[in-house]
Design a protein with these regions (language model features):
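Conserved catalytic-core motifs of GNAT/GCN5-like acyltransferases
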Residues: 99-108, 214-231
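A conserved beta-strand-loop-helix scaffold within acyl/acetyltransferase catalytic domains
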Residues: 148-159, 164-167
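N-terminal charged segments
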Residues: 1-100, 120-137
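Conserved beta-hairpin
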Residues: 135-150
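Conserved active-site alpha-helix within GNAT-family acetyltransferase domains
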Residues: 177, 199-217, 260, 264
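Actinobacteria-biased recognition of intrinsically disordered, low-complexity terminal regions
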Residues: 1-22, 226-264
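Conserved acetyl-CoA-binding loop-helix of GNAT-fold acetyltransferases
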Residues: 162, 172-186, 206-210
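Conserved GNAT acetyl-CoA-binding A-motif
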Residues: 56-57, 187-199
C-alpha cells in the first residue's frame, strides 16, 4: 500500500493533491476562474484529469509547459479543453496510456455502525473482481451480497473509492443503492468515500445519488496499457512544484451484459 512517503518530493505532491480532494469532499473547491493546476503524478500508476467547476487538475509527469501548449491549441471552449477529445488524445499519444472513460465523480461522508445489508467478505485475491480492482486501487477489500458485489480500496492520491456490481437478475430491487450505502459504513477511519460512475450508466448514477453521494466533478484516468497496468505504488520521485495554466473563461450564456457496474 502506498503511504506517499517514499521520497520527500513525492510525499509533498501527494499531500497537496490529497488535501485538494479532502477539501472537495467537504464542498470546498478551488477558485472557479477557468484555470488549470498541473501536478506531478502521485505515483507511477495514477495519471489523469480531474475537472471541477471552472477549474481542472491535470496530474501527469509530462512537462507542464507541454501541457500548457497543448491546452492552448485545443479548438474548443477553454473550460472544456482539459477533458476534450483532442487534448485527451494528445495525452494518450504522449504517455502511451489509455483513457477508458470520462467518469462522473461523486463523494459521500462515512456513516456509523455496520451496514444493514448482509455481506460476505471475499478473501480470495484471485477472484476476478479482486484482480480487476487491484489494477486501480490499493488496500482492496471485496464483499459479496445476494446478487451483487461491493469493492473498497484506495485509489487516486490515496482516496477511498467504492465500486459496485449488480447482477441482471437483481436489478430494480434497490440493491445498488444498498451496496453504495454499505460502502459508507465500511470505509475505514471516518474518511469520505468516493465513487466513479460512467455518465451513461444512469442506473449507477441514480443508485449512488440515492445512497447520499454528491456530485463533485468529472475525471479521466490515464491507464497503463497491458500487463504493466496494475503497477505497484511508489513515489513518482518528481520534486518540481505545481504549475497553473490560466485559460480565459467564456462569458456566461444568457437565460453487453445484463448487469451494471460502476467505473472502474
Amino acid at each position: 500500500m502506498d503511504t506517499g512517503t517514499e521520497t520527500a518530493g513525492g510525499a509533498a505532491v501527494r499531500s497537496r493533491f490529497a488535501a485538494l480532494l479532502d477539501d472537495a469532499a467537504r464542498g470546498v473547491f478551488p477558485p472557479a476562474d477557468g484555470s488549470v493546476t498541473v501536478l506531478p503524478q502521485p505515483n507511477p500508476r495514477d495519471a489523469g484529469v480531474l475537472a471541477l467547476t471552472a477549474h481542472a487538475v491535470i496530474f501527469t509527469d509530462e512537462d507542464p509547459e507541454w501541457v500548457r501548449e497543448r491546452l492552448a491549441a485545443v479548438e474548443s471552449d477553454p473550460l472544456a479543453a482539459p477533458l476534450s477529445a483532442p487534448f485527451l488524445a494528445e495525452l494518450m499519444a504522449r504517455t502511451g496510456r489509455l483513457v477508458n472513460n470520462v467518469d462522473f465523480i461523486t463523494v459521500a461522508a462515512p456513516l456509523p455502525g455496520p451496514p444493514e445489508l448482509a455481506l460476505t467478505e471475499i478473501a480470495d485475491r484471485d477472484h476476478p473482481r479482486v484482480r480487476r480492482a487491484l489494477a486501480y486501487r490499493d488496500a482492496v477489500r471485496v464483499w459479496a451480497a445476494d446478487g451483487g458485489v461491493l469493492v473498497l480500496g484506495r485509489g487516486v492520491a490515496g482516496r477511498w473509492e467504492a465500486a459496485v456490481e449488480v447482477d441482471g437478475t437483481a436489478r430494480r430491487k434497490g440493491l445498488g443503492r444498498a451496496l453504495a450505502t454499505a460502502a459508507r459504513h465500511l470505509v475505514p477511519g471516518g474518511a469520505p468515500v468516493w465513487a466513479q460512475q460512467a455518465p451513461g450508466n444512469a442506473a449507477s448514477v441514480r443508485a449512488f445519488q440515492a445512497a447520499g453521494f454528491r456530485p463533485v466533478g468529472a475525471e479521466a484516468l490515464l491507464v497503463a496499457r497491458g500487463p504493466a497496468a496494475p503497477a505497484a505504488r511508489a513515489s513518482a520521485g518528481r520534486e518540481s512544484g505545481p504549475a497553473r495554466v490560466s485559460l480565459p473563461a467564456p462569458a456566461p450564456a444568457a437565460g453487453s451484459r445484463n448487469e451494471w457496474r460502476t467505473s472502474p
